[in-house]
Design a protein with these regions (language model features):
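ATP-dependent adenylate-handling active sites, centered on carboxylate activation for C-N bond formation
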Residues: 1-161, 175-190, 201-203, 207-212, ...
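A short alpha-helix-loop-beta-strand transition element characteristic
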Residues: 164-171
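C-terminal catalytic/acceptor-binding lobe
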Residues: 193-194, 198
Length: 266
């Protein structure tokens, strides 16, 4: 997101600061992030590492203590995978499910990563009146029949010149990809280096609840168990696209594995 953040900063005239993170910082923060979150959910951990390091930099390098964040827009207006929703009813049910589970995934990430760095969040999309209004809209209007996900949200900002059109109509990218595709790839490669195939199979069999299904998920689970032994049921389930929908039966939570990802994240 670096180049897009620069574009927005130049457009609105904001004081722009960039935070770079290294592979060493990603790995060195992994245990802290898992302990902080109290989860072994794959996508929550991936996304939290970037947010944790950014919030840490804000705390250490600035006097800013209150942040605006964009959580809950996905739950209300759709993820990349909700392009596959078969109809409005299915979209609405999925949206309701995601809102009910906010505290276990996206809001868990934002709350912990921000507060541990002595910062506060303001979440405009979480305004109760706004949430009630959006959830009361005809869900058929939220289906991606416009060739662009989250069309209603984009359309709301189309007038007034709040954002350049290149940003407003940009393809949606996976959250953890916004800090760089290489971060997720690096985490996967690191996990692969920690276990042989035989070790992976035998260690996974130790867990009957929410059994790890990749070496990355096993790595996160084993770190989780060092801090929260025998408390796996703290996590209800892995965050994943709705596997009952055509096109969503995938084994990784990242939108990058979906057939409709296209130019997203470029």
């Amino acid at each position: 997101d670096l180049k897009y953040a620069r574009q927005v900063a130049d457009y609105i005239g904001s004081d722009h600061t960039e935070v770079y993170m290294t592979p060493d910082e990603v790995l060195s923060s992994l245990k802290n992030v898992i302990q902080l979150l109290g989860t072994y959910d794959i996508t929550t951990i991936r996304a939290s590492i970037g947010m944790y390091l950014v919030c840490k930099a804000i705390h250490n390098q600035t006097d800013i203590r209150v942040l605006l964040t964009g959580e809950i827009s996905d739950e209300l207006f759709g993820y990349k995978y909700t392009d596959f929703a078969p109809d409005g009813k299915a979209f609405q049910e999925e949206s309701q499910k995601r809102v009910r589970e906010l505290h276990m995934y996206d809001v868990l990430r934002a709350d912990r990563c921000i507060s541990v760095n002595s910062l506060e969040a303001r979440v405009p999309f979480g305004d109760l009146d706004f949430v009630k209004y959006v959830m009361a809209l005809d869900p058929e209007l939220k289906l991606n029949t416009y060739g662009k996900g989250k069309y209603l949200l984009r359309h709301a900002f189309e007038q007034g010149g709040y954002l350049p059109d290149t940003i407003l109509w940009r393809e949606k990218a996976a959250f953890s990809d916004a800090v760089g595709h290489s971060m997720v790839d690096y985490l996967k490669e690191y996990a692969e280096s920690q276990y042989t195939d035989e070790e992976f199979k035998s260690r996974c069999e130790r867990y009957t609840y929410a059994r790890p299904f990749t070496k990355e998920s096993l790595l996160y689970r084993e770190i989780f168990e060092t801090f929260y032994p025998g408390q796996a049921e703290m996590v209800v389930d892995f965050w994943m696209p709705n596997k009952t929908w055509k096109g969503c039966n995938v084994n990784d939570p990242s939108a990058r594995v979906l057939s409709n990802y296209g130019d997203s994240g470029k």
